[in-house]
């Protein structure tokens, strides 16, 4: 099966003409304009994007052939997905969250921290959550260059340069 990426979550219907209110999971709100079609979690078919409207915190989407609220209500709560062929090319040193989850974290001194299990949005920065499988302890590291000097998808690892007291 293809690896799918979440680009939004359908939070509700909008009006009676089959429009859906979607919370974008992309840093690039206009992402949906680049897509001809998407998948919906739990369904195998492609859904071709009709209209796109922007609201302050959401995107209003409609799909071709889905012009009635009764048809689209089943999608509430589902994720809007794309396959890897639809990925945008990212700038250097920028990564998809889905590619980072599961990478091993090591300090610059080669001390194993655990696997990256979550990425939390905390204000203007993200925070990486590493979990040590043996102790089940979470270690939170701000995802800034000062503390994360290297990420290697090829080596499947993230290098952390913590300050004193950050990891204990």
Swiss-Prot record:
Homology family: Belongs to the RimM family.
Subunit structure: Binds ribosomal protein uS19.
Domain notes for this protein: The PRC barrel domain binds ribosomal protein uS19.
Keywords on record: Chaperone, Cytoplasm, Ribosome biogenesis, rRNA processing
A Pfam short name: RimM
Keyword presence, Transport: no
Full protein name: Ribosome maturation factor RimM
Lineage: Bacteria, Bacillati, Bacillota, Clostridia, Peptostreptococcales
Biological role: An accessory protein needed during the final step in the assembly of 30S ribosomal subunit, possibly for assembly of the head region. Essential for efficient processing of 16S rRNA. May be needed both before and after RbfA during the maturation of 16S rRNA. It has affinity for free ribosomal 30S subunits but not for 70S ribosomes.
Database matches in InterPro entries: PRC_barrel-like_sf (IPR011033), PRC_RimM (IPR056792), RimM (IPR011961), RimM_N (IPR002676), RimM_N_sf (IPR036976), Transl_B-barrel_sf (IPR009000)
Gene designation: rimM
Residue ranges of coiled coil: none
Biological process (GO), any one: rRNA processing
Domain of life: Bacteria
Gene Ontology MF annotations: ribosome binding
GO cellular component terms given for this protein: cytoplasm; ribosome
Residue intervals of the PRC barrel domain: 92-166
Organism of origin: Alkaliphilus metalliredigens (strain QYMF)
HAMAP family registered for this protein in UniProt: Ribosome_mat_RimM
Cell location: Cytoplasm
